[in-house]
């Protein structure tokens, strides 16, 4: 008698089966008059930002014209927003900033230099200097 598999609906997990981008919306704010927004205005007029937005269809781009310095606001899935000021930054640096922050998870960056922590016991056991034969022990 053949064994039949039980049908089950797959559970959506990030990285298994489907990938959900953590950055779901980017707001671009610029001033139409200010000098610090010139490079961003050039990026908007020559279609560079449009090409970038076409390459990222899973991110919603919102462009606002407000007074003040230009900035990029990144909205992440964990309800975190990051604001990055891009005043007087060249076009290629703006694109680099867009790619860098759109690939982040929204969590704070931290330096991972902690010791390994595990809930499992060590395979070798805990080392003790008394495990070494007496002839090889360190003598002071």
UniProtKB/Swiss-Prot annotation:
| InterPro entries in the cross-refs | Ribosomal_mL43 (IPR039927), Ribosomal_mL43/mS25/NADH_DH (IPR007741), Thioredoxin-like_sf (IPR036249)
Can you say where in the cell this protein is located? Mitochondrion
Gene3D superfamilies, A to Z = Glutaredoxin (3.40.30.10)
Keywords per UniProt: Mitochondrion, Ribonucleoprotein, Ribosomal protein
GO cellular component annotations, sorted alphabetically?
Answer: mitochondrial large ribosomal subunit
A Pfam family (short name) is L51_S25_CI-B8
Gene Ontology molecular function = structural constituent of ribosome
Q: Which GO terms describe its biological process?
A: mitochondrial translation
Question: What main location does UniProt list?
Answer: mitochondrion
Q: What PANTHER family does this protein's entry cite?
A: 39S RIBOSOMAL PROTEIN L43, LARGE RIBOSOMAL SUBUNIT PROTEIN ML43
Entry function: Component of the mitochondrial ribosome (mitoribosome), a dedicated translation machinery responsible for the synthesis of mitochondrial genome-encoded proteins, including at least some of the essential transmembrane subunits of the mitochondrial respiratory chain. The mitoribosomes are attached to the mitochondrial inner membrane and translation products are cotranslationally integrated into the membrane. Also has an extraribosomal function, being essential for mitochondrial genome integrity. May interact with MHR1 to take part in the mtDNA repair mechanism.
Q: Which family does it belong to?
A: Belongs to the mitochondrion-specific ribosomal protein mL43 family.
Name the record gives this protein? Large ribosomal subunit protein mL43
């Amino acid at each position: 008698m053949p064994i039949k598999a039980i049908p089950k609906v797959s559970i959506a997990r990030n990285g298994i089966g489907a990938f959900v981008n953590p950055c779901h919306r980017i707001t671009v704010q610029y001033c139409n008059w200010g000098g610090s927004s010139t490079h961003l205005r050039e990026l908007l007029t020559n279609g560079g930002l449009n090409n970038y937005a076409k390459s990222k269809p899973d991110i919603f781009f919102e462009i606002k014209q407000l007074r003040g310095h230009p900035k990029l606001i990144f909205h992440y899935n964990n309800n975190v927003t990051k604001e990055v000021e891009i005043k007087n930054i060249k076009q290629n640096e703006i694109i680099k900033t867009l790619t860098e922050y759109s690939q982040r998870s929204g969590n704070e960056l931290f330096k991972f230099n902690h010791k390994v922590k595990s809930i499992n016991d060590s395979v070798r056991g805990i080392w003790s200097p008394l495990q070494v034969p007496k002839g090889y022990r360190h003598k002071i």
